[in-house]
């Protein structure tokens, strides 16, 4: 039986890059090598590389999702995405792979786009009858920050978080007005927009 060529896409561009690489290393050990030819691909910005002979980095040809080997090339049959944050969870990789006609391991392009952007996701689910959502303030890079006005509108504490990020990186529970701006600045290191939500006490 012909082995399937699997691209194990790891790394990414977020602050979780090293965690994603470590996760991919564990996944790599779990593949049945008698059935799959697994090639780890480090995705970092526009550079998608895998190890060639002598640990030489080889660039993936993104025009046909292949990797050069000797005088030929290996075309990937499937993509296993092990990237936290962008571009593995926000629809970028999913959109590319769908254009290439390559099946992959995560949710689809549309659902990835709609759920990675927290504000967009809230707009969509707000149409569900009976579903209550936390009140919010959305800030975009360059917006004027009025911490007193935000606290007056939402109360304290509030949660300050990147609007588009793959995990809890950059998330802060803010209990005072004085801590608001530093928390917003921290969230902006992870995303171009920051979502501030009221605190809702309850059981998760």
Q: What is the predicted function of each stretch?
A:
Residues 175-204:
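Phosphate-binding site of ATP-dependent enzymes
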Residues 125, 151-171, 192-202:
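ATP-grasp fold ATP-binding core
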Residues 124-132, 186:
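Basic phosphate/pyrophosphate-binding loop/patch that engages nucleotide-derived ligands
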Residues 139, 171-176:
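Short beta-strand-to-turn element immediately C-terminal to the catalytic PLP-Schiff-base lysine
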Residues 1-110, 114-116, 120, 124-127, ...:
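ATP-binding N-terminal substructure of ATP-dependent carboxylate-amine bond-forming enzymes
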Residues 101-104, 131, 162-169:
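Acidic/polar active-site rim loop that often engages polyanionic ligands
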